[in-house]
Amino acid sequence: MESGHRFDAQTLHSFIQAVFRQMGSEEQEAKLVADHLIAANLAGHDSHGIGMIPSYVRSWSQGHLQINHHAKIVKEAGAAVTLDGDRAFGQVAAHEAMALGIEKAHQHGIAAVALHNSHHIGRIGYWAEQCAAAGFVSIHFVSVVGIPMVAPFHGRDSRFGTNPFCVVFPRKDDFPLLLDYATSAIAFGKTRVAWHKGVPVPPGCLIDVNGVPTTNPAVMQESPLGSLLTFAEHKGYALAAMCEILGGALSGGKTTHQETLQTSPDAILNCMTTIIINPELFGAPDCSAQTEAFAEWVKASPHDDDKPILLPGEWEVNTRRERQEQGIPLDAGSWQAICDAARQIGMPEETLQAFCQQLAS
């Protein structure tokens, strides 16, 4: 498959479902995982899209990812609930956690959902968008257990994960305002994408094993490993630390330290604490009008008319529209890794080639 090829989202979705069905996932599980991965690619976040498939296959083969498992309620207390993800697909465990949280927010006006011991839960904005679709504000603190890949401010090596932070605010007649990013300067998956493409990452994102700044993504993919840096120096580090505690410790999960280190980089275990709020609770009748007035005010001051000011979440909206029309781009290296993973789990070559022909058409 040539580099720069664009794939039809629906055909790619069918292929992903077939891959996970081949791995042993039940139909609904395969669909939920495919839904999430495709949605990440459509939103422009290829780091959390179908390029994760090889890592998931390795994690499953190593015994870290447990297929056909579900989140289990550990404790329920009114508007608060704690769930054990049971190392299930994060796309399943987080789906179940958000559904329960949204139900509780409808009932109580506010809900707090703590999920621990889940496999990789993917793009956090996806879960926030579910809350926004129900009319709710949500705040998400996420930690990555036992795979340190980010150095603290003034640190010499990795001490914690990329620890995403996410907030969404729903709007009645337009896309929700969405903040969703790793507390590292770039997501780890973006180093994987750059590595496959053979391109550097922006300056200020990485240090090598000796603590020397570099733009070479190989330092996060090949031994000896370097480290990601936090965004905005001490500010990103402080937010990452709070995500580690609120997402990890408060959820009933683990934080990253000597006793919790994982032996495999594919053993991606996430914890997430989510607060879901019905904005109607606050009795702010002018909230929507004030939000729109602010949005219009901010967007009215571009430095360059060819580079419009975007609201939080608007880039994803624009990218989603473009990729739904033109297809999902995928580089040759990533596609080869996905095909190799499909072969590893026993997908017949004729089935794989049939999908390749469909995707190439």
From Swiss-Prot:
Stored Gene3D superfamilies: 1.10.1530.10, Hypothetical oxidoreductase yiak, domain 2, Single helix bin
Signal peptide: none
Catalysed reactions, semicolon-separated: 2-hydroxyglutarate + NADP(+) = 2-oxoglutarate + NADPH + H(+); 2-hydroxyglutarate + NAD(+) = 2-oxoglutarate + NADH + H(+); 3-phenyllactate + NADP(+) = 3-phenylpyruvate + NADPH + H(+); 3-phenyllactate + NAD(+) = 3-phenylpyruvate + NADH + H(+)
TM helices/strands, residue ranges: none
List of residues binding NAD(+): 48, 122-124, 178-182, 234, 270, 313-316
InterPro entries, sorted: Mal/L-sulf/L-lact_DH-like_ah, Mal/L-sulf/L-lact_DH-like_NADP, Mal/L-sulfo/L-lacto_DH-like_sf, Malate/L-lactate_DH-like
Enzyme nomenclature, EC number: 1.1.1.-, 1.1.1.237
Similarity comment text for this entry: Belongs to the LDH2/MDH2 oxidoreductase family.
Protein name per its UniProtKB record: Hydroxycarboxylate dehydrogenase B
